[in-house]
Amino acid sequence: MRTGFPPEDYVPRVAGQPMSAQGEAILGTAPQLRAPAPAARAGHRPASPEMLRAAARRPWRYRPGVLASGVLPEGRRDVTATAALFASLFDAWPTDPLWVCTVRLRDGARVVFGRDQLAPVADAVSASCAVPGYFAPVTIDGERYVDGAAYSLTSLDVVADLELDLVLVSAPMGSTETVAPDIGNALRVPARAKLAREASHVRGRGTRVLAIQPDRRLRAVMGTNTMSAAKRRPVALATREYAAGVLREEWPFRPPRSAATPRPPTGGPRPQRSH
């Protein structure tokens, strides 16, 4: 969004459908991101021995996802394609707010680029895409970073103190209902619970929260392999339809009043209904 790319063009871009003139001007010539290339077998050495040594002394300081990012070996797939795309779109950090959540591997701290410190947008976004154990960490100023989802899948808590009127949360790894904790739902069970806690905290600060999580039908379309390029088009189309339904339910459409339609009187005697 900070590039000026219209939100209504997101799905057409993924689905190969016509985009608006503005969307074409920004991303019309940019290639689609391909599925990650197969990587060499990962090693067995933990990605962050430093974090593990610290966790051995104070394990309560680390969230499970953060600890897992340190235990898992470094991923071998790189994110250079993502970096190249965003490097072509940004030559500096945008003036409008842009917060990109990552986890610093050395100590497991969450670092929100754009709030805590700055970096090239391409590097920050690439780091936020570096799923632990799958993609290689991204090095920024000598520190290695991975996806901020290791700390929180939605990072809703970072906006708790901003006194916003409304927060819309896209939570593709959540679920609208309780699901069985099997291998296909390994992340959905804790993600749903974590989102509920974060949303409750933000609502307690006076901010309205609307979280869009997939229902059973949408989860069936998504499947369990979130990295499948073959799923992008059907998932994008199904998600657009599903999200539109959620928003319609939250904010029912009211046709605009015609200028020729007189408004009801606001004072004085009301007209009598004939019998």
Model-derived regions, located:
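Patatin-like phospholipase
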Residues: 1-275
